[in-house]
């Protein structure tokens, strides 16, 4: 048994998560303008939305743009002053910090999310795990010592492309 291959089977997302203390988040009470400032300054595509430390949803730059250009009839200034809670997506799957890394990888395959929120039993946001963090961990474990890596997935067009996604 290769010891490093054995370790990946028990690796937990808490080992690779970005902790809450280092995370860019936005409050439900913040404005769209404040959220966009954080998104743009940090080069992000989306932000976790919190109420205190309680995870309540995700705000994506793409969704804000779609809402503004497709559905909004007011001024840009009025839109910028609206609250984040009006635009966040709340039906977001979360995982616990003891979830196995391969389970997180499988979630990335079946969804369009860039990150997965990690919460405790009280829905307190502990951090996030990103696609990039998962792939970096696999790269550390497998490195260049192996000629290939097997990925098992459903036989559906585009699944492998979504799994590999932009890093």
What are these regions (language model features)?
Residues 1-2:
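Intrinsic-disorder-associated, low-complexity terminal segments enriched in Asp/Asn/His/Tyr and depleted
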Residues 39-42, 47-63, 108, 116-132:
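A glycine-centered beta-loop-beta connector
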Residues 32-37, 105:
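Short, basic/aromatic recognition patches
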Residues 6-22, 60-96, 100, 105-109, ...:
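Tandem CBS (Bateman) regulatory domains
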Residues 11, 30, 34, 59:
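Conserved active-site and cofactor/substrate-binding residues in soluble primary-metabolism enzymes
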